[in-house]
Amino acid sequence: MKKEQVLNCQFSQWYPRFKKFSIRSVIIPLPENVKDYLLDDGTLVVSGREESPGCSQRDFNCTTEDEVQWSDDENTATLTAPEFPEFSIKVQEAINSLGGSVFPKLNWSSPRDAYWIALNSSLKCSTLSDIFLLFKSSDFLRFIYCADDSPDPNIKYELVLRKWCELIPGAEFRCFRCFVKENKIIGISQRDYTQYYDHISKQKEEIHKSIQYFFQEHIQYNFPDEDFVFDIYKDSQGKIWVIDFNPFGEVTGSLLFTWEELRRSWNLGDVENEEQDCPIFRYTNSEVTVQPSPYLSYRLPKDFVDLSTGEDAHKLIDFLKLNRNQQDEDSDD
């Protein structure tokens, strides 16, 4: 995979080309100090939170300073969130212009593994603090930053705010991932492959044809690479929306395919794919066991996972000692 292929898939590169067929979005350059804040692995202190004009009696029981037991320990550190006033104003103006609620992401990835930490268990954000909370809690975004010890200086990181669209329950069955090799679709996969949707099996021919037609009319030969992956959403009116573009390779989820078969299955002389109008369409059928969400493992802190799997022996030993001490104390009582 070439570096150009990855760069061509960043949001600001493809969005202007396909803006007509995508969700309305705003792109804001990410200042260096904001990037440093997101990369900081220290204690999570969320910045960008609007100051409350006062303590609400309805929501909280206000307590006077004399009633609070403050620590006199000189070693107690006070964690203060950094502020980014200019950036905060730009973000809030963008959020307001998009209707007050947005879906945030960076150049390539979104914090989809961190939805569980939000109060609404959603990626829906209405303030900068909502965005920071998701970004600081996401392993997916850190992976992008940490994948290369010497990041390309030409890469300008950007905050992408996409207008929030409420999807009806079960609307995930309308999302599909398309794999393109040599400017021809070789495979289409159900995006949410962990669930079975009866609608897909009933409409598979129509879905197959509409995606192929949309690709030929609007995407084919218009994307700078000939090998790539793109995600689409087909709404209830039949209109197709471009959601994202990704590199053709292991950095992108292959869903119901494997990258091995995607790479070797396409051959200009291959009988199965001899005609362009015959990409392989895979979806979860009723005979396949429904699989758990791939993001469930991100709901637990890594320490808990290490304990449960025994991957960190020192943590496990400390835990057993703590448990034994607790039992000894209970027996003494």
Residue ranges and their predicted role:
Residues M1-D333:
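Preference for protein termini
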